[in-house]
Regions:
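Extracytoplasmic gate region of multi-pass secondary transporters
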Residues: 29, 209-249, 253-257
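Helix-to-loop junctions at the C-terminal end of transmembrane segments
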Residues: 60-72, 258-270
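Conserved MFS/SLC helix-loop-helix module at the cytosolic interface between two early adjacent transmembrane helices
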Residues: 61-95
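Paired small-residue
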Residues: 87, 98-106, 296-304
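Cytoplasmic helix-loop-helix junction between adjacent transmembrane helices
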Residues: 103-141
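Helix-loop-helix hairpin linking two adjacent transmembrane segments in secondary transporters
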Residues: 133-185
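C-terminal transmembrane helical hairpin of 12-TM major facilitator-type secondary transporters
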Residues: 272-316
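A late C-terminal transmembrane helix in Major Facilitator Superfamily
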Residues: 326-359, 367
Length: 393
């Protein structure tokens, strides 16, 4: 019975990510070139819509971090699933940049709810039932979200117009809400006695906290530019007009198992060294699409980027759970605010740069440079004296 409940909880969490992240957020990436062609969406406007999405995400993270009642978290999470469906349908029901921006903002709210409250509810259930405080299985839903949204857009775009595509995506989301809602267990308000020792909060030192926040801000910049614009970037390369979609699919396929693998790597070498390795590969993934003129660069970049971006998120959220096992959303929200600020600023800056240069390529160099600064933060964190044991447990 325990295994069955664990499986249902894990699957519900993954499906929740498919809805709030895959349909509400990641579908925008393969839809971006379609909307540029069919709806007249400009380069700069594409960046600003992404910024609106992350403004909603940032707002949602801030609000989620202020919620301490588990039952309230559960209710808001479930309604966040519905909001993801509504905001996706809005993209096809309006034909103005203002309407799209409102839709993207609401989608960002739902993504924050899915990432923050969904992850916290799943971790709460795992820890209160004596399981490891790891979210690798849960965050495999990030990679699956990329794959699902990409194929959904591909199959639909061959038969329908851009606005119909969004409506069909919202219908898919509505169908997925049913198992996501039904299979997620109700939160457990009190820890079982035999697991009480695992539920003691162990806050990080001020130095560790600041370095983690600085690194995660840099990781947010490193993530958002590629994840938002990769399809458009690759399609704009010489002789790559139709390759961008497949690069995005490869990225998602690489991400799907990555969180589980990074959990195993972190167990072996420690969380900080695992994050260092992931960050080096992440930088390579950002820059490789611009190397050479063939398929090697985009494909190798997608593999490196996909294998690392979700793993970084999963490991950072896992650390938050170890620091605050009774209130994992507490530090999750603080970290994600830093991540969210980066994701508000970077798309707008990339959109502005793209208007000046005529392409999104320069944004990749900026993202790689910022991610390199994040590497320095990790190296400093690695040298902090008396690093809390839970970082490398």
């Amino acid at each position: 019975l325990s295994l069955s409940l664990r499986a249902k909880a894990s699957i519900a969490g993954i499906i929740g990510l498919l809805i709030t992240l895959g349909i509400a957020r990641f579908a925008y990436t393969p839809m971006l070139p379609i909307m540029r062609e069919q709806a007249g969406l400009g380069l700069g406007a594409g960046g600003w819509l992404a910024t609106a999405n992350y403004a909603g995400y940032f707002t949602g993270v801030f609000l989620c971090g202020r919620i301490s009642d588990l039952d309230l978290k559960d209710r808001i999470y479930r309604w966040g699933l519905i909001l993801a469906v509504i905001s996706t349908a809005m993209m096809g029901m309006v034909a103005s940049e203002l309407g799209w921006a409102i839709s993207r903002f609401l989608a960002g709210l739902s993504t924050a709810v899915g990432m923050m409250l969904g992850g916290a509810l799943v971790m709460n259930w795992l820890m209160r039932n004596g399981h490891r405080a790891e979210l690798g299985v849960h965050f495999s839903g990030v990679g699956l979200s990329v794959v699902m949204s990409s194929f959904a857009v591909l199959m639909l775009s061959e038969h329908v117009l851009w606005w119909e595509n969004w409506l069909f995506l919202s219908l898919l989301g509505l169908v997925l809400v049913l198992p996501a809602w039904a299979w997620l267990p109700k939160p457990m308000p009190a820890p079982a006695v035999e697991h009480e020792s695992k539920m003691q909060d162990r806050p990080p030192t001020v130095a560790v906290r600041r370095l983690l926040l600085a690194f995660y801000f840099c990781a947010g910049v490193g993530f958002v530019v590629t994840s938002t614009f990769i399809v458009a970037i690759v399609n704009a390369l010489p002789k790559m007009e139709d390759v961008g979609f497949w690069v995005f699919v490869i990225l998602g396929a690489a991400a799907a198992p990555s969180c589980i693998l990074w959990d195993l790597i972190a167990r072996r070498v420690g969380a900080i060294d695992a994050l260092l390795l992931a960050s080096v590969l992440h930088i390579a993934g950002i820059l490789l699409p611009l190397v050479g003129e063939g398929l090697f660069g985009p494909i190798a970049g997608a593999l490196c980027f996909g294998f690392t971006f979700a793993g970084i998120v999963s490991m950072m959220m896992g650390l938050a759970g170890r620091f605050y096992p009774t209130r994992p959303a507490k530090m999750m929200s603080t970290l994600t605010i830093a991540y969210g600020i980066a994701q508000i600023l970077a798309p707008a800056i990339t959109g502005w740069i793209s208007e000046q240069t005529g392409s999104y390529n320069a944004g990749l160099f900026v993202a790689a440079a910022v991610m390199t600064v994040g590497l320095v933060m990790l190296l400093q964190l690695r040298g902090v004296a008396r690093l809390p044991d839970e970082l490398d447990s």
